[in-house]
Amino acid sequence: LRLLADVKLPAIFTDNMVLQQRSDVKFWGEAAPGRTVRITTSWDGRSYETAADASGRWTTAVETPSAGGPYTVTISDGRPVELKNVLVGEVWICSGQSNMEMRVADRVTNMERELKEADGYRNIRLLHIDNSTSPAPLADAKVRHGGWQVCSAENVADFSATGYFFGKELHRNLDVPVGLIETCWGGTLAEAWTSGGALADIPYFRKRVEKVKTLPESTEARNRIFVEDMEAWRGEMALVDP
């Protein structure tokens, strides 16, 4: 979580971000228990109030207009802080394996021209999520480059090529701001991106989901168990096919 005065926000809420148009966008974070948190949006001057619960967590939703901007979003627990250069448009998650991970700078066709032209797409914004694992949904994420970035030759070079070209085509056709969130991991299985609840509905995965629930929270501890299980499996396979 990123410190904003006494208010803490997840790392995905930063300057230059894009919010989904014509929707109720959820904001959440932490503050002192019982503290009132007010969010004010510059597109309509409206304020939304909520209060932190006993554990300090708060959440509320704000209504967004049709595509436009730039705007500011002010979050205050008594000391206001602004998120600046905020756009409203279309937000897409770019997820997948290594084909989604391939960067624009990884020698895509006409790479030099594409990088040069990227400076002209400043209403495309980029958010790059770092890889991490968790057996349960997280309230925060690790992000690269401090959060959302304005599209430019420098910033897009390290971004997903598939994601960027999709976003550029969307921007050209709809003429609205586009926010692209890269969250991909080469070689991962579809099951790794699926909730435990959804997998438990499939008989084949039911026992496996129950096993995951018994694993320790520490990533390092889970990795040790994985290595031990893998070694045991290899030992069994060696007996079958030495």
PLM features: what roles do these ranges have?
Residues 4-242:
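Cell-envelope and extracellular/periplasmic
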